[in-house]
Amino acid sequence: MLLRIRSPAGTARLTVQPETTGEDFAEAILNTIPAADPQPDPATLALSNQPGAAGESVPFHALSGRTVGDMGFSHGDLLFLSYKPRAADPDSHPAMQATAPHPQPAQPDPSHPKTHTDPPMPNTIPLRDLSSVQEPEIDQYWEKQTGKIERKRDPAFCRHGDKAMCDYCMPLEPYDPKFQSEHQIKHLSYHAYLRKLLSSRPPTASSATDLPPLSPTSLSVITPCPTGAHPSFPDGICSTCQPSAVTLQSQPFRMVDHIEFASPSIIEGLLSAWRRTGTQRIAFLIGREDKYEKVPMGIKVIVEAVWEPKQEGELDGLTVETPWSDESRVQEIAKWCDKGLSVVGMIYTDLTPSPDDITKTLYKRHAQSYTASSLEMLLSAAYQLSHPLSTRMSPTGHYSSRFVTCCLTGDKDGGVDILAWQASEHAEAMVKAGIVEASVDPAVVRVRKPGEGEYVPEVFYSYKNEYGLQVKMPAKPTFPVEYLYVNITHGFPLAPSPLFLSNAFPTENRPGLHDQSMQVVITQLAAILKTSDAEIGDAGTWPGRIKKDVEKWLSDWHLVTFLCMQGLFSLKEQQILCRAATAHAHPNDTYALEELFASGGWQTLLTIVDSEASANARSNPPPTSSFNNLGIDSPAFAGPSTESSAPPSGPDSVGAGAGAGPVGGRERVCPHCTFVNEHGGSDCEICGLPLDG
């Protein structure tokens, strides 16, 4: 006869004979429980003809000494097995490690193919491990806040005193749709969106704190299939392992609400490179996250500096190294400079001079063309995937990203404007699964045709037609790029207080424009120290004015990173250098500059500066030699010609009418920046341009 057994592990079918003993029957029932599921406590096993406590429950030990025919079962009966899980052995190892990106699914017992087991969710980690996820400080801050939107007493509708409250003045939820519409907030903030998801759960339910509300989108085929009922893809596929169809809509929230540039000089640095070369530039944004008060529970990114990677600029594009080789080192130096400082995004130029007026830029990104091209969107999504956001609100321990993208492009007035955006969470999933590609038309994205051994799910996009009805359209072969990103506002502070005060040191990776070198460091530091009669090698004799000038000179992101990467300072001294560069922003760190002056690396640098200054002093010609080399009298010694004022003889001398060559063969004035070069090279020490013009 056929009997059905329903247990917490699922439903199974057993074929037994009337003469089957109770012991064999009990063993067959236990075999329906997969080995990967929690095993039952033998003392709690019971069999019933009704679920729960409604029917007659028979303990397992009562089956001993009997046969199936004696138990009164009929063909097709449904029996209910109940038990309590056995307590876990504390010495046993966990079944799945939290760090495993693709946990192996539990395989059902092949001897019972009809046993049904719920497959585990792909790319998940046990909930108990989410407590170890380290969230950013801004997320920890907003989790502790109520997020309510406070309202004042309405004099027109409120009929109560100052200490009372009614429907017209009570605080609103951060996701209130009416407030969002009145203040023209297109996207909810990340934490307001979380509050909206959690608001649908009962406040007393434990799931409100145990089950993460966010579910990362996965568009890849799960291999191997969690059911184990067929070979892995591409040899087999089922509804469990294949991804669901995708319906694209405008993302209702954004991870970052605003981008604030700490100083206009950050943007000016990129623009100056484009103005001098005419080629495009890209840089990574160095900044930190902070609260943004203009939207409920908002988050903004404050950009303090940029780092330009190795690249080759072109008139209409650029080539940049991938992956970015110096990222880990730059991240480390940024962390030393200020708490929370890290790589937060990227910025690049897309500027073209107007053919009618080269002093203006071409306006090519607008509502009738595109804001961000499909290729740019795929690039943004790829960088966001490499910079995920750590959060306990997702079963995987991370969700989307706060990596932002900015573009400097022409505006309608011929000036330069900043466009900022983020790729949506769906865009990240589609790029990760490799189902989209860039198009020749920058305003649309192509859905890839699946190749051999590939699976591309159905993709749709939804919009409102001219009648106000929601319409769903297939996205193959193309769909608008607007479905893959959210716009971000940007601006500058009214009272700038940048973390880095100087930008005099050359920017990295600009060969031919201006190069970084120790000679530039020595020249700039010597120019500050020579304004005082104090001894260069003894920082203790420097007046307060000189120390302040040195501190401001050190507060340069490009200078700090250059010195840290030169090997002149030890690891501990590099940390002191970063502290000294940002000491003005940390009033409690008053001894950072003195610690730097006392370090061995700084003393070595001063020794080099001192020896360079001494060598220059010995090589400088007398005051009148410049006039003698030009064949004219010195204004200080104008009068009858004397033997001492005669032009020096030798190959370096230049007579009157012979032309003005390099002064004494050493000093040469740069025709570009007018700096007097005292070396015999062919390029200027400051601007790096040829001295021959």
Swiss-Prot record:
Keywords: Cytoplasm, Endoplasmic reticulum, Membrane, mRNA transport, Nucleus, Protein transport, Translocation, Transport. Residues 85-132, 615-662 are annotated as: Disordered. GO terms for biological process: mRNA transport; protein transport; ubiquitin-dependent protein catabolic process. PROSITE patterns: MPN (PS50249). Residues 259-399 form the MPN domain. One of its GO terms (molecular function) is ubiquitin binding. Residues 615-631 have a biased composition (Polar residues). One of its GO terms (cellular component) is endoplasmic reticulum membrane. Pfam families: NPL4, zf-NPL4. Residues 644-655 have a biased composition (Low complexity). InterPro entries: MPN, Npl4, NPL4_C, NPL4_Zn-bd_put. It is a peripheral membrane protein. It is found in: Cytoplasm, Perinuclear region; Endoplasmic reticulum membrane; Nucleus membrane. Involved in the import of nuclear-targeted proteins into the nucleus and the export of poly(A) RNA out of the nucleus. Has a role in the endoplasmic reticulum-associated degradation (ERAD) pathway. Belongs to the NPL4 family. This is Nuclear protein localization protein 4. The lineage of its organism: Eukaryota, Fungi, Dikarya, Basidiomycota, Agaricomycotina.
